[in-house]
Structures are given as structure tokens and as C-alpha cells.
Swiss-Prot record:
Subcellular localization, as worded in the UniProt entry: Cytoplasm
Domain of life: Bacteria
Source organism per UniProt: Thiobacillus denitrificans (strain ATCC 25259 / T1)
The keyword Cytoplasm belongs to this UniProt entry's keyword annotation: yes
Residues in S1 motif domain copies: 621-689
Protein name: Polyribonucleotide nucleotidyltransferase
Annotated keywords: Cytoplasm, Magnesium, Metal-binding, Nucleotidyltransferase, RNA-binding, Transferase
Example GO molecular function: magnesium ion binding
Domain KH: 552-611
Enzyme Commission identifier(s): 2.7.7.8
Binding positions for Mg(2+) per the UniProt entry: 486, 492
Family as reported in the entry's similarity comment: Belongs to the polyribonucleotide nucleotidyltransferase family.
């Protein structure tokens, strides 16, 4: 099969989709080229379902090869290692809009691998990778209800920009990625500089309209090069089993969902489930039939919850659709931490801790476009005890990395600049209880924790998770969703922002038919909830707190760049001695900017004084005090400033004649001298005599010899 190409214009970029030359043994393979950023995306699906499989095993792996940017990996092995945080986030970005488009009951293993093979530093690879994944799936013949298009939208000078370059994004008030099918938006991921809801929604609609060019190109490619459709059909529904299950479990589920407390409710649901499965799943039943029973129970449970809400009954925990759960806030929870906040909303709780550091603590990120440093980190951890379970504890999972990134996006817009606040900031959110919306609790707690640490944020930021349940023309938007409502609903979206506007928006839609009007209603209701939470946060922490006594203090100063070598000294000897003497950390930049980090201001001021002495310029005619460091036959060498010595000639020691220098000076003796001269080579001529009162003349008019 020869290579087949489809090209289309996408914003100011040319995009080419190519198949048929590379990775021909995969179920589907596409190379996407977007202005020299090239991504190879492959799809492989197993023909047989693994015995006992009861879920859809879809894996998405996005990987960046350093050769794509003409670089060799660092480290001893000189090869790519485990996925970076950025690679993990893009893997999730690809997964989220694709997963809902596979049919219920499809349990064949599917693996998508997206490999960045060429990188234009101005064109991010996430959009080409997502388009490539959609195209490869469309070619594979799998039961995939696509294709999916994807677009990045910026907002520059009051106008939407399609697929802005990385340079343009620096001037953009918005960085939004939207993915969807021809008729529906499926996923939104964004950060913004306090933009109003109508601008955010307009960006989603703009991106969805523009992505039709990508969808059309994928359809054309699939028509020409696509494989035959799989001979797969969803398993036939066993209506007799479903009816029996309803008779066994529906009333029990109705009663269970009248229980407002999560653990008691889940225990009641588990009891109903166990009794139903004991009746319907027999020992000799095969896995497929058992899975049908489990799926039917899940649908029955979802139907019970959804119908209660759509019929106007109270939600699972007794609230109406617009009420936020009770909120409590406590700051300064950890006495030795630089800043801490305990944010509790219903049965979701986050203990969020802020640590302040110096420039040396910035995170160095080795990306394809080169290394750069990040002064703000936000890490999200959710241990198994948060949901009353046991489980693995260790390195963060994809979900934790994604939630941490969302919370970070929400806070970026209100952080002080480096000039305003020279600290590195690390925020850690420990989820100690979870029943929905833990990432948004991390946003609220992160804001309060930073303020408790003394970071001068521009505004309070709150986040809220919203849900949607839709049946036909009936729909209900749910404010501050529980975990069960997230699991059983049709849309979950998280909105974070200030009183002025949105700073982060994440949306995942599981069904088609979500109109612009429904999204508008949801965003309006989310704003109400956000304003309610902001009011509680402001009442608890109205302004930034004083910095903790245990946080480092940073003193900034500027020196002549030519003096940097004097402060550092040979082999770093001077700066090493300075840090040991004062107990501080000293960072010096090439432009002469100096930052002194200390735990006590006294130590910091001492270090500053020492640096000022080292870098001070000697002034002719000025008086200095310093030790005698060496005696000579014709005078002495006196240190007037760190690194600056001068010659005190024997004739300048005293008004009378000096025959023996040792009679007047000793090594180590501190003397006051005046600078008489500094020649073009920087050599100094000193005088003690100039500071002494001249003796009165003798009666004979003669003076003592000098």
C-alpha cells in the first residue's frame, strides 16, 4: 500500500495526515505533520477479549523523543526514561475525549502510542497527537464513534486565535484545548487570566467550529485507507435477567440512596448488590454472563439516582441542585510549616501546605524545547484512606498528576511576579477525605495556604465541580457534585476563578446533545457556587498573613557585574566562607542581582554588609579602617576592603621620622588610613599621617624631621 496523504489549513498552520508507509503492522497508524512538528500515532487492538475482563482496557502513551529537537538525553544512560509530568498530562488529554466513544460492553484491549518524532519549538505536539489518535482509530476499523477533532484557542487583543504559537501564547489571556466530534464537544482543558464566562464559552464554540477542518480530513483519509469495520456487536440484553434484577434490587437502592452519610450509604448499596449477585450470578456462569449482570446493576443504580434528581427529589445527600455543601476553613494548622490550610467541604477535605524556598529550589524541567525552571509547583496526593479503602502508596498516578496540574492552572493567574515576591513556592494538597470535587478543594485550600504563608496573591481563587444529568429534553445542573454524582452523571466540569473571572476550566462530556445553552446554564450556576465559596474564604482569610518565623527571608541587592568574581572568589572560596559565617544562602545572577536567603534578618543583613564591603569601590580621599596584613622594610600592606590592599609607605606612618616600622605597627593591628591615590592599575597609596594632627613648630622655627 502506497502512502496516502491529506492536507488542510489549520489556523496559520499546514497540517498533513499520512498513512501507509510507517508502522504498517499496527491496526492503524498515522503521521501528523503540523509545521514540522511530527507525531507518529499507532493503534493496536487485540482480537480476543481477555478471560474475566469486565472493563474497557484502553491505554494511551504519549512519548517525546529528544532526537525530535536535535538533542541527546542527559543522565548516565543517555536515553529516554519514564514519562515526564508533561507527557503524562498529554496522555490523559488524548484519553479523555476518546474513551467515551467506544461502545458499552467493548472489552478488547486497545493501546494508542503517540511518538513525537520532530519538534518545532513554536508548535506544541498535543494537538497533532490528539488528531493523530483520532485518525489512527478511524483507520483501524474498531467500533469507535469518531472521528474526534481538537483545537487550541487563544484570546489575544480581544480576539480568538486558532492554534496560536508558543510565542503568541505568552501574550494570550487564554490557553484552551477543546476536542469533540462533528456534532458535540467532548472535552475542554484551559487556563485563563480571569476571563468572564461568556468569553470562555465563546472559545469552546469557536474551537469546535474550527476543528471541523480536521474532522473532514480524517473522514477523507478513512474513506480512502480505512480498514474494514470489526465484526462486533454489543451483547444482546437479557430482559428477563434485567426484570429480575429490578425486582431484587430497585427498592433496596431507593432506600440506600435516602441515606445521606457516604459510608453508611455505600454499605447499604453493597448489601443490595451482594444479595442481587448471590441470586443472579451462579458458580457455573461464565464471565461474559456475569459481566452482563454487573453492567445491568450499574445501569439500574444510575437510573435510580438520575430519576430522583430529574423528578425534583433531593439529591443523594439531601441538597437541592444549587446548594454547596457546608464549608469549614482553618489556617495555620501545622505550626512549623510556612503556610497551611485545612479546607473541608462536606465529606471532601484537603490539608494544603505551602513551603517557600529560594531560586535554588526552582524545579528544572527538561523539555523538548530545552530546559527551563518553574518557581511554582503544586502536588496533589490522594492516599487510599481518603475514601476509606486500602491500596498502594507510592509514586503519583496519572489521576493525581492531572488533578495537581488543574489546581496549579487555577492559581497561576493570581500569583505575584518574581519581582514582587522572589520566593519559589511549593504547594502540596493532601486529600484526607474524598467524596467528590477534591481537585477543587485543592484550589481553595491552595489559595488559603499561600496566603497563610505570606504570598501576596492578587485575589482569592475558589473552585467548584459541577455535574449534569440529561434525559431527553429534561436536564438538571448539579452544583458541587458528590463522587457518585460524578460517576453516574453525563457531564462533569470544574470551574475555578476569582470574583473577576475564570482562571481554569475543565470539562468532560460523556453524551452527545449538550447544547451551547446547556453549557451556558451550567457555567452561570457554577459562577453562583464560586461566589458563595469565595465569600466564605474571604470571611476566613481576608488578607495575606505575616510570613512564618520559619520561612526564609530574602534580601535583594544589586552589585556591579564586574564584581561578581570578587564575591565568588577563587574556586568559590569567598562565597563559601560568607555562607558559612552568616548561615545564609546567596544566589548571584549574571546581571549582578543578588538574593540572600536567611532565617533571621540579622544574618541576612550581615551577609549584605559583607557583600557591600567586597564590592565597594575605593574612593580617593576617603578614610578606611583595616588590618595590617604584612610588614615591609619600606612600609606596610593594609587591607582597606575585602580584596583591596594598599601600600602604607614608611613616610606616611607618622609625622616624625620612622626608623623601625615594628615600633609603630604589628601584623593584624587595625589602623585608620586615608586613600591618597589610586593609579590606573588600581594600586592604592595610603596614609596614616594625614589623619594625625601635625606637631607644633619648635621655638627655633624648626620642625621635626618627617
Amino acid at each position: 500500500m502506497s502512502a496516502i496523504k491529506k492536507t488542510f489549513t489549520y489556523g496559520r498552520h499546514q497540517v498533513t495526515l499520512e498513512t501507509g508507509e510507517i508502522a504498517r503492522q499496527a491496526s492503524g497508524a498515522v503521521v501528523v505533520n503540523m509545521d514540522d512538528t511530527m507525531v507518529l500515532v499507532t493503534v493496536v487492538a487485540k482480537n480476543e477479549v481477555k478471560p474475566g475482563q469486565d472493563f474497557f482496557p484502553l491505554t494511551v502513551d504519549y512519548q517525546e523523543k529528544t532526537y525530535a529537537a536535535g538533542r541527546i538525553p542527559g543522565g548516565f544512560l543517555k536515553r529516554e526514561s519514564r514519562p515526564s509530568e508533561g507527557e503524562t498530562l498529554i496522555s490523559r488529554l488524548i484519553d479523555r475525549p476518546i474513551r467515551p466513544l467506544f461502545p458499552e460492553g467493548f472489552f478488547n484491549e486497545v493501546q494508542i502510542i503517540a511518538t513525537v518524532m520532530s519538534s518545532n519549538p513554536e508548535v506544541s505536539a498535543d494537538i497533532p497527537a490528539l488528531i493523530g489518535a483520532s485518525a489512527a482509530l478511524s483507520l483501524s476499523g474498531l467500533p469507535f464513534d469518531g472521528p474526534v477533532g481538537a483545537a487550541r484557542v487563544g484570546f489575544i487583543n480581544g480576539e480568538y486565535v486558532l492554534n496560536p504559537t508558543n510565542a503568541e501564547l505568552k501574550d494570550s489571556a487564554l490557553d484552551l484545548v477543546v476536542a469533540g466530534t462533528e456534532s458535540a464537544v467532548l472535552m475542554v482543558e484551559s487556563e485563563a487570566m480571569e476571563l468572564p464566562e461568556d468569553i470562555m464559552l465563546g472559545a469552546v464554540v469557536f474551537g469546535h467550529t474550527q476543528m471541523q477542518a480536521a474532522i473532514n480530513a480524517i473522514n477523507e483519509l478513512a474513506d480512502e485507507a480505512g480498514a474494514d469495520a470489526w465484526d462486533w456487536a454489543p451483547p444482546a440484553e437479557d430482559t428477563a435477567m434485567v426484570d429480575r434484577l429490578k425486582a431484587l434490587a430497585e427498592d433496596g437502592l431507593q432506600q440506600a440512596y435516602n441515606i445521606k452519610q457516604k459510608r453508611a450509604r455505600m454499605a447499604a448499596v453493597d448489601e443490595v448488590r451482594s444479595k442481587a449477585f448471590a441470586e443472579l450470578i451462579t458458580a457455573d456462569m461464565d464471565t461474559v454472563a456475569a459481566n452482563h449482570v454487573k453492567d445491568a446493576f450499574h445501569r439500574l443504580e444510575a437510573g435510580v439516582v438520575r430519576n430522583r434528581i430529574l423528578s425534583g427529589q433531593p439529591r443523594i445527600d439531601g441538597r437541592d441542585t444549587r446548594t454547596v455543601r457546608p464549608i469549614t476553613i482553618r489556617t495555620g494548622v501545622l505550626p512549623r510549616a510556612h503556610g497551611s490550610a485545612l479546607f473541608t467541604r462536606g465529606e471532601t477535605q484537603a490539608l494544603v501546605v505551602t513551603t517557600l524556598g529560594t531560586g535554588r529550589d526552582e524545579q528544572t524541567i527538561d523539555a523538548l524545547e530545552g530546559s527551563y525552571s518553574d518557581r511554582f509547583m503544586l502536588h496533589y496526593n490522594m492516599p487510599p484512606y481518603a475514601t476509606g479503602e486500602t491500596g498502594r502508596v507510592g509514586s503519583p498516578k496519572r489521576r493525581e498528576i492531572g488533578h495537581g496540574r488543574l489546581a496549579k492552572r487555577a492559581l497561576l493567574a493570581v500569583l505575584p511576579s518574581k519581582e514582587e515576591f522572589g520566593y519559589t513556592m511549593r504547594v502540596v494538597s493532601e486529600i484526607t477525605e474524598s467524596n467528590g470535587s477534591s481537585s477543587m478543594a485543592s484550589v481553595c485550600g491552595g489559595c488559603l495556604s499561600l496566603m497563610d504563608a505570606g504570598a501576596p496573591l492578587k485575589a482569592h481563587v475558589a473552585g467548584i465541580a459541577m455535574g449534569l444529568i440529561k434525559e431527553g429534553n429534561r436536564f438538571a445542573v448539579l452544583t458541587d457534585i458528590l463522587g457518585d454524582e460524578d460517576h453516574l452523571g453525563d457531564m462533569d466540569f470544574k470551574v475555578a476563578g476569582t470574583e473577576n473571572g475564570v482562571t481554569a476550566l475543565q470539562m468532560d462530556i460523556k453524551i452527545t446533545g449538550i447544547t451551547k445553552e446547556i453549557m451556558q446554564a451550567a457555567l452561570t450556576q457554577a459562577k453562583e457556587g464560586r461566589m458563595h465559596i469565595l465569600g466564605i474564604m474571604k470571611a476566613s482569610v481576608s488578607e495575606t498573613h505575616e510570613m512564618s518565623a520559619y520561612a526564609p527571608r530574602i534580601i535583594a541587592m544589586k552589585i556591579n557585574p564586574e564584581k561578581i568574581r570578587d564575591v565568588i572568589g577563587k574556586g568559590g572560596a569567598v562565597i563559601r566562607a560568607l555562607t558559612e559565617e552568616t548561615g545564609t544562602q546567596i544566589d548571584i545572577q549574571e546581571d549582578g542581582s543578588v538574593k540572600i536567603a536567611c532565617t533571621s534578618m540579622e544574618a541576612g543583613e550581615l551577609a549584605k554588609k559583607r557583600i557591600e564591603e567586597i564590592t565597594a569601590e575605593v574612593e580617593v580621599g576617603k578614610v578606611y579602617e583595616g588590618p595590617v596584613i604584612k610588614l615591609l622594610d619600606f612600609g606596610a600592606i593594609v587591607n582597606v576592603l575585602p580584596g583591596r590592599d594598599g601600600l602604607l609607605h614608611i613616610s606616611q606612618i607618622a609625622h616624625e621620622r620612622v626608623n623601625t616600622i615594628g615600633d609603630y605597627l604589628k601584623e593584624g593591628q587595625v589602623v585608620r588610613v586615608k586613600i591618597l591615590e589610586a593609579d590606573e592599575k588600581g594600586r592604592l597609596r595610603l596614609s596614616m599621617k594625614a589623619l594625625l594632627e601635625a606637631p607644633a613648630p619648635t621655638s627655633g622655627g624648626e620642625e621635626h624631621a618627617s
